Amino acid sequence: MKHLVIALSILAVLTSVSLASESTSNPELMPLEQVRPGMKGHGMSVFQGSKAERFEVEVLGTLEGVPNPKQSIVIARLTGPLVDRTGVFAGMSGSPVYIDGKLVGAVAYAFPFAKEAIAGITPIKYMIDIFEQGQKEEQPRSSQHVSFTTLIGQSASTSIGSLPSLPSSQIGARSTAGDALAPYVGQTIVPIATPVTFTGIPQNVVDAFAGDLRRIGIQPIAGVGGGSSLGPMVPANENTLTPGSSVSVQLVRGDFTIDAAGTVTHRDGGRIYAFGHPFLSSGATNWPMAESSIVTVVPNLNNSFKLSAAGNLVGAISQDRATGVYGQLGDKPRMVPVRLKVHTSRNKTETYTFEIVSDPFLTPLLTRITMFSAIAATERQIGSQTLKLSGTITIDGQSDIKLDNSFTSPSGAAMFAVNAVAQPLAVLLNSGFNALDLRGIDVDVTSIDSRSSGTLNRLWIDKTEVRRGESIEMQAFARNDNGSEFVERIPLVIPADSPIGPLVIIVGDGASLNQADRTQPSAEFSPRDLGQLVRAINKLKRNNRLYVRVMRAGTGAIVNNEEMPVLPPSMLATLGSSRTSGGYTPLSVATLAEHELPPSQFMIIGQQVITINVVK
């Protein structure tokens, strides 16, 4: 009897060690060549809470050339009381599968609307190999051609079309209608959807941006996850992100939370392999990696999904590629801190603090979503509205980007306001300058439940013949929305270097002059460095004030992307000679002076032109 007790104790210890080895140490890997139909094993995934639970797996065969050339996936049937209730569910991606104690790979693919839980398994070798190869330092990027028409698009558009084009992806958000392959839905194997939880963001806001989100492969789920704090990183231990546990890829954290839920396939020391298919296929990344717990898995006839809540920050996701995502415990993610203060139309102030991933495509989009949510939480979206926006975008080693604008609309101005912040971010992040390091975004928005605008009707000037250096007075007449007329007095000094002859004086709002600038040679340029790009963005005119521009017909030039309106004939001849090429664009109309007027009581919209004559 004593020997039997000892034997059973040893067996229990060995069994415990065997199970622990799958989660805390490196299990032996099973090559794809050894996988045969009929083989049975088990998988691990979290169905509730944070503890991974077992389900059974039976190999049915392999598909060659799927999902990519020279690759194959294992087709298997999943069974067990938990899987039988939910089927293959969104968020299950990455669940490890073991046969004879060896790691085969990750549950990653499924057939939509299948009656049984039939899944595709990404072989673990593919997941490891793709992240072992090409782990090189990021190569310096060259500056891109930046257009002022892109910058000023914010004043005329409320759609994502005004921002740099988002890449289209069907990963995790494949449509079941309106697609050329719609008749074959259910007959094709697709990546298991990755549920992305939106916390603090109303459903109507998620709906407003659903098209943009689905284009890049995000399946939004609103208001079902728990928020995450801006707490510091928690040191990892042997129980952190073990195989089968739930992992969260955080895109926004703080008062707003946007995070994607998946499952850890393999942990090798501090290296984490998960998902088994791409999340957004973004390549090199630097996103927060957090622990995650599951509220429940919701059975759904279309696509079951898990409700998750992000937990402690434990590292960073550094790769998002064809066979999964890869992260490193202890690595610090690169985030952009945001402070957003909304002064409501009812004299209250709401402050939001959060962080957004630093990414050329995601940062502008997520900024729009979070800002729109903050405004929509307290302000109306139908009816006359004026939003006054101020703030800064802080860049390490550069001058701040100044935000100072107003937007008014009879049907809500929020989308115009959020674009005014997202647009400079998009241009900066897509400029190609490696030196760019966004240190923070600080924005104040003041809301008024009425329109505060007027239309510029006419100009008056006290004299039409002037001398160089002489002071004159102009008056700009504008009419506001209720029909009342008011006058803006504008003192003006004629430039001392004005040529004899006619001068054109233009008075207009920032948006009108920005649109006029689109036709000028200076509207498109390739900045030499980040500092020049920052100066160009800060030169953009604002909607909430008038500008006075004095112009003349004549000869000037743009030299090395800087406008030089007055150049002597000898210099123009040298620049235009056959011995000189590049960096030179002639100008037929030159701006002699330009003045920004202080903000007025109303937003004045429109543009008027008057001509004077300079005499001796």
Sequence positions of predicted segments:
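Positively charged n-region of N-terminal signal peptides that target proteins for export
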Residues: 1-5
